[in-house]
C-alpha cells in the first residue's frame, strides 16, 4: 500500500533516483491556513547533506504545491505536493545491479515483484520519507489550530542513552540530541562508525502534547496500534514503545497503574493511552532504528542468480539513519493525530448536532 490514514489520508509516490517524489493529501478540511514557509522549514529539518553526521547527498528538497490550495488556504480538495530530485548519482549503484545488499529490501522486492530499481533502493529508499514530512507538516498546521504539538529528539545513539529529555535543546542540536550532556559522546560514536565505514543505530523519542481525551477506536483502530503502525512503516524502524513499553513487563501492577486524582493522572506509565484511546496526558513513544544497512565494509551476499559473492558498496549514506528519521517520526505522528481527530467528530451525537444543527 502507498496510502496511510482513513479520513486524513496521505499517498506518496516516487523513487530515490527518479525525477521526483511527492504526496497527495486527501481529507484536509477546507479553510486551513497553509503556511508554505513552515512546510519548507519542516523539510529542511529532514533534508540530507547538512552536516558530517548525515549522508553527503545534497538535495534542496524544495516543495511545490500543485493543487488544493487557493489564496493561502486549503480548498477541501486533494493537496498535491512535489519535490524534485536534483542530486542523484545512479552510477554509484551500477556494481550492485544484480546483487542483493544485506540489510536492504533488495532481496524481498526482487522476489515479490520479479524486478527492482537498484538505483539507491528505488521506492524502498528513505528518500521517499521527504514526501511524508511534507504531508506531516500540513497535519501539524491543523493540529496547531487545536493547541496540539508534536516534538521529538534523539534519546540514544549506539547505546549511549539520554538521562534527560529537553525538546527545546534538541531543536538546536545538529543531531537533535535530547540530552546536551550526552551529545558529544553520541556525535563521536557516529563519526567513529563513519570513519570505520560502518554505521550505528539510534532511538527517537516522540512527545505529543495537548491531545484531547477520547481519540482512538476501542478495538481495531486503537491509538497506540495506529501510531505503532505509522512508526513501523518508516525505513529502518525495528521496534516501538508506548509509554514505559518493555519496562512495563517487569513492573508490578501497583507501580505500573497510573493513579487518578481530581486534577488528573499522577504518573504517565501508559504514555497517554488507555484501552487504545487517548487519556489526555502526553503521548510518549520511543522509536528504535537499526544501524543504516548501507555500509562500506566488504560483505557477503548473493546475486539474483544465486551466485555467492563478496562486494563493497559505493554511494552516499547516513552513518546513523535515526538522526533524520526522528523528523519522519514527528510527521507520521502528526498524520495519525489529524486522522484520529476527524474520525472522532462523529463518535457522539452531540458532535453531529453541533456541526449540523445550526
From Swiss-Prot:
GO biological process per UniProt: amino acid biosynthetic process; aromatic amino acid family biosynthetic process; chorismate biosynthetic process
Gene Ontology molecular function: chorismate synthase activity; FMN binding
Gene Ontology terms: cellular component: cytosol
Cofactor note: Reduced FMN (FMNH(2)).
Pfam family, one: Chorismate_synt
Catalytic activity line of the entry: 5-O-(1-carboxyvinyl)-3-phosphoshikimate = chorismate + phosphate
Cofactor(s) this protein requires: FMNH2
EC numbers: 4.2.3.5
Binding site for NADP(+): 46
This protein's pathway: Metabolic intermediate biosynthesis; chorismate biosynthesis; chorismate from D-erythrose 4-phosphate and phosphoenolpyruvate: step 7/7
Keywords (A to Z) from UniProt: Amino-acid biosynthesis, Aromatic amino acid biosynthesis, FAD, Flavoprotein, FMN, Lyase, NADP
Residues at which FMN binds: 123-125, 235-236, 275, 290-294, 316
Main function: This reaction introduces a second double bond into the aromatic ring system.
Quaternary assembly: Homotetramer.
Similarity section: Belongs to the chorismate synthase family.
The protein's name in its UniProt record: Chorismate synthase
Source organism: Sulfurimonas denitrificans (strain ATCC 33889 / DSM 1251)
Gene designation per UniProt: aroC
Amino acid at each position: 500500500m502507498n496510502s496511510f490514514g482513513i479520513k486524513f489520508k496521505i499517498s506518496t509516490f516516487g523513487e530515490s533516483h527518479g525525477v521526483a517524489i511527492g504526496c497527495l493529501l486527501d481529507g484536509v478540511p477546507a479553510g486551513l491556513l497553509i503556511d508554505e514557509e513552515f512546510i519548507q522549514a519542516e523539510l529542511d529539518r529532514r533534508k540530507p547533506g547538512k552536516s558530517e553526521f548525515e549522508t553527503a547527498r545534497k538535495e534542496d528538497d524544495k516543495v511545490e504545491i500543485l493543487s488544493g490550495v487557493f489564496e493561502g488556504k486549503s480548498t477541501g480538495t486533494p493537496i498535491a505536493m512535489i519535490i524534485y530530485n536534483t542530486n542523484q548519482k545512479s552510477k554509484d549503484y551500477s556494481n550492485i545491479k544484480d546483487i542483493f545488499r544485506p540489510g536492504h529490501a533488495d532481496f524481498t522486492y526482487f522476489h515479490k515483484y520479479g524486478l527492482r530499481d537498484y538505483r539507491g533502493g528505488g521506492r524502498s529508499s528513505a528518500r521517499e520519507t521527504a514526501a511524508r514530512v511534507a504531508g506531516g507538516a500540513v497535519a501539524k498546521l491543523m493540529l496547531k489550530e487545536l493547541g496540539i504539538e508534536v516534538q521529538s529528539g534523539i534519546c540514544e545513539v549506539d547505546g549511549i542513552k539520554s538521562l534527560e529529555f529537553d525538546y527545546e535543546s534538541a531543536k538546536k542540536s545538529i543531531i537533535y540530541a535530547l540530552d546536551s550532556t550526552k551529545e558529544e559522546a553520541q556525535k563521536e560514536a557516529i563519526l567513529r562508525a563513519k570513519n570505520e565505514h560502518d554505521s550505528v543505530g539510534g532511538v527517537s523519542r516522540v512527545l505529543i502534547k495537548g491531545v484531547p481525551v477520547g481519540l482512538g477506536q476501542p478495538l481495531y483502530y486503537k491509538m497506540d496500534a495506529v501510531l505503532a503502525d505509522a512508526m513501523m512503516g518508516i525505513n529502518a524502524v525495528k521496534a516501538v514503545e508506548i509509554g514505559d513499553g518493555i519496562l512495563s513487563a517487569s513492573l508490578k501492577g501497583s507501580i505500573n497503574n497510573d493513579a487518578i486524582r481530581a486534577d488528573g493522572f499522577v504518573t504517565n506509565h501508559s504514555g497517554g493511552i488507555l484501552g487504545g484511546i487517548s487519556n489526555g496526558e502526553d503521548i510518549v513513544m520511543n522509536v528504535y532504528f537499526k544501524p543504516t544497512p548501507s555500509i562500506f565494509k566488504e560483505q557477503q551476499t548473493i546475486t539474483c542468480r544465486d551466485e555467492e559473492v563478496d562486494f563493497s558498496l559505493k554511494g552516499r549514506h547516513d552513518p546513523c539513519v535515526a538522526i533524520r528519521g526522528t523528523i519522519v517520526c514527528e510527521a507520521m505522528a502528526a498524520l495519525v493525530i489529524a486522522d484520529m481527530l476527524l474520525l472522532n467528530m462523529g463518535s457522539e451525537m452531540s458532535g453531529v448536532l453541533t456541526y449540523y444543527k445550526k
